[in-house]
Structure formats: C-alpha cells, structure tokens
Amino acid sequence: MGDGMNSQSQSEQGFTLIELLVVIAIIAILAAMLLPALSKAKIKAQATHCMNNSRQLMLAWMQYYTDNNDMLVNNYGQPFSALEEQNQTYQSWANNIMGWGANDMFGNRMDRLDGITQAPFYKYASSVAMYRCPADHFVSSKQAGAGITARPRSYSMNGFFGAYRPDVPNPGANNNYPTYRQFLKSGSIPNPAGFFVMCDEHPDSINDGFLQANPHTDVAPSKWDDLPATYHDGACGFAFADGHSEIHKFRSRACTILGVTFGSVNLVPFSQDPVAGTADSLWVAERAGLPLQ
C-alpha cells in the first residue's frame, strides 16, 4: 500500500501540547476579563431585586394605612416584638427577633416564620421572600449545623414610623429621641418622598423589626445607633414613604461598610473616619426623622 494508507494529516493528529497550552491561556485570560463584569452584573441584579422587594413592602405599608383609617402599622422594638411572637399576639409588622443562634431567647428556632406570617401586615405583603434581600445569604455555623439555610428577614422599619410599643405614653414623640416626632398616621408625614420607611439592616445589627437612626443633623453623632447594611457593593437599599426605593452608596469603609462577624455588631466611632463616616450618618439622619414643632 502507498504511504497515504499509514500516515495521518496534521488535522487528524489534533492539537500539539504547545497549541493546547495556548488555548488554555487564552481561555484563562478571557475568564479573568469576564469575571469582574459578571460579578458587577450579579450585584446589579441583586440590587434591582432588593428594590423590587422593598417597593412591594411599601405598597403593602400604604395599603395597610389605607384600610386602617390612616394609621401606620405598628413597629415595636425590643422586648415588645419578642413578646408579641411568644404570646402569639403578633401586633407589630414583624414580630421576630433575629440573632446568630439556632434558637431565639425563648428556645424557638431562628428560622420560624409565624412572627411574620401571623402579623396583620402579612395580609398585604404575603410572601416571605419579600422580607429578605437576595444578597443576604448569611447564617452562622450554629444555624447551618441546625439545618437553617437562611434567616427570615433582612429589612427593618425606620423607628420614627408606627407605634413603638403597645402602650405609648407620648404617642407624638419618639421613644428614644423625645424631641422628634413619631409618625403614627400617614397624613402627618409632610414630605413622603423625603423620609425612608424601610432599609436593609446589617446582619450583625438586625434583631427586632425596628431600626433606630440618630436624626440630629445639627450635631454629628459619635457612632451609629443601628447599622444599615451594605449588601450591594457598599450600598444599602432604602424605601421611602411615597413608595419609591433607591440604593444609596455609603462612603466610610471604617465606620459603615463593615464585614459580618456573626456576633455583636461592632460600631466604630465616626472619629475613626470623621469626613466619610459623618457624611454617611447625616445622609440617613436627614431622611429619618423630623423635630417636634
């Protein structure tokens, strides 16, 4: 037989080792170029989903007061919200207390949902997925060991909105900042687009459904009261009383954009980053509360 019967062309022999290494190198370079873009796309998609969730919560919040003679839904702080869940009275918008243990202070599993699903507010926001930011994937090792894959809630309500406790001695004033107004009816909010109602709260800071912000804009506070979350590449989701949502980018990596410790929140004094930290705090303060007239 001729030579053509027992020889192969180069195309039939496949890649040489050098050619294969070149292809692998090109793929690695392309992957390195694409990964940052894919990461940014994921962050943007999660932020969009977060805003959709908070908008739905705001629609529910608005429908609630429409059906209840203009009264805003209750927004109990500790220990009142915990007692609402334990006593099965469920009168706050969210009655569960978040933490890093497998169980809450009463021995109930941390992923129980009745504090949300049995509340009157749930009639208007009847999807448990709505209460969690898609970027909130944090569970502690204890929770993971107990089979808990997600905590129920990422959002908290501005502490200047809704009744703080079942028996409010001075319903017109905030419990923690008594020279500031407590909004109990929607008609008392002078500029709904200027005040936030819901926001992401940092995983180490979140407990009850109540977020306390220092509302003073004339004197810079020493540190955060409750810490907003920065799930979205240093940014936090806020939803306002007129129903709109936005993602706000914070500045301070020393005081505001903090990692998750799966323990008590580490509130860093603004003196550690006086320009950016104070700017972050004042942005929230300007949109949190209103002095009593």
Enumerate the predicted regions with their spans.
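Short, Lys/Arg-enriched N-terminal segments with co-localized hydrophobic residues
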Residues: 1-4
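Amphipathic alpha-helical segments typified by the pilin-like N-terminal helix
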Residues: 6-52
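Short, well-structured segments within or immediately adjacent to enzyme catalytic domains
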Residues: 50-293
